[in-house]
């Protein structure tokens, strides 16, 4: 995944700053998926150290891989698993609930770490009053800044939009919910 992100960055590099919406970033690759591979013992300590050095060098050399903002579509693993089962995509057939639980825990501990006292709570760091006033009222209570010790230095203070995507929302049938979420994402893009 990391190499794919870098190739995308190289492809998009031009004089104009593009608007890109990506499913994952190099940071979610590092903080979620590489951690999962390491914990599964598919990557040893030496390999993780090499990866970290390489990661830091590449992020420093290619500032375009640092996003202007993150959007966290938050749902519990059971909800994600049920939605996957309903989609019936062949490539998702082998994804277990346990795997989704592991990824969810890694996303939560990355974005909402336990030592901050905010694990499982939608709060990291509120925007400053000046920034807060520039936020659209529909997303004002959903935008936070990533600023924890475990965050990579290049994403400290990057805004994140947290959206709850729980089972009571059926985006395939509820057109109004889809419009509301689309508006929130558009308002966040306008903000960043």
Predicted features along the sequence, with ranges:
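Short, structured active-site "lid" loops
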Residues: 1-7
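Generic surface-pattern signal
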Residues: 2, 14, 56, 60, ...
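ATP-dependent NMP and nucleoside kinases share a basic, alpha-helical "lid"
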Residues: 9-109
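NTP-dependent small-molecule kinase module
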Residues: 85-192
């Amino acid at each position: 995944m990391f190499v794919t992100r870098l190739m995308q960055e190289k492809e998009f590099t031009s004089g104009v700053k593009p608007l890109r919406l990506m499913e994952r970033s190099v940071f979610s690759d590092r903080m979620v998926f590489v951690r999962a591979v390491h914990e599964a013992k598919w990557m040893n300590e030496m390999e993780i150290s090499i990866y970290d050095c390489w990661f830091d060098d590449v992020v420093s050399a290619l500032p375009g891989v640092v996003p202007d903002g993150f959007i966290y579509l938050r749902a519990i693993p059971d909800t994600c698993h049920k939605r996957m089962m309903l989609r019936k995509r062949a490539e998702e057939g082998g994804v277990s609930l346990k795997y989704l639980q592991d990824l969810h825990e890694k996303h939560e501990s990355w974005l909402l770490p336990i030592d901050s006292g905010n694990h499982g709570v939608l709060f990291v760091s509120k925007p400053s009053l000046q920034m807060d006033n520039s936020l659209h009222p529909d997303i004002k209570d959903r935008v936070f800044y990533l600023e924890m010790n475990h965050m990579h230095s290049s994403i400290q203070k990057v805004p994140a939009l947290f959206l709850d995507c729980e089972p009571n929302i059926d985006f395939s049938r509820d057109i109004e919910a889809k419009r509301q979420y689309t508006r929130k994402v558009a308002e966040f893009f306008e903000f960043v």
